[in-house]
């Protein structure tokens, strides 16, 4: 049963997703595309299971994007205090641009281009062979500390992660489910 705030969309192909305001999007199943563009502005949440050649994601505001699966190339832009959680997304080449206090965690294997202005942070599983880094401000980039399963340790989760341990509650937002 769907309420007025829930919509279920079944679409054979999804090439672009533009979201504004307080909204949540969760995929049911794996989204397979050559190119996928995602733009989230506001206090939203996007959780997608992907197999893509190229992912272009733009996060503006206090949003959260969570990706898992595979991507050959990703280009992420975070403006503000947003979070991109991509530890479970196997990426070959990544370009990450952060302006503000954003945080990105990813698993990149071949190359990483990182550009941070402000206090943003990038955490990667293992240092790729090719890295090009520019930091203007108090930003940081480093490998995350891992436990025996390859996940972050408790101390790593506390470093720069504004989603854990905050005193304010996350807002209730309407949910959209996408079936592929």
Model-derived features: where do they sit?
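Intrinsically disordered, low-complexity terminal regions
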Residues: 1-180
């Amino acid at each position: 049963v769907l309420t007025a705030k829930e919509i279920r969309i079944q679409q054979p192909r999804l090439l672009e997703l533009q979201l504004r305001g307080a909204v949540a999007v969760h995929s049911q199943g794996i989204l397979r595309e050559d190119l996928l563009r995602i733009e989230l502005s506001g206090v939203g949440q996007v959780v997608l299971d992907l197999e893509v050649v190229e992912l272009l994601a733009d996060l503006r505001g206090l949003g959260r994007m969570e990706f898992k699966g595979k991507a050959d190339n990703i280009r992420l832009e975070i403006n503000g205090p947003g979070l991109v959680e991509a530890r479970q997304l196997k990426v070959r080449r990544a370009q990450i641009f952060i302006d503000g206090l954003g945080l990105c965690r990813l698993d990149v294997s071949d190359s990483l281009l990182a550009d941070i202005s402000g206090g943003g942070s990038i955490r990667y599983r293992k240092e790729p062979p090719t890295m090009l880094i520019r930091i203007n401000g108090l930003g940081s980039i480093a490998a995350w500390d891992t436990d025996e399963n390859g996940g972050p340790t408790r101390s790593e989760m506390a470093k720069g992660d504004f989603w854990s341990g905050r005193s304010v509650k996350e807002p209730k937002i309407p949910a959209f489910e996408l079936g592929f």
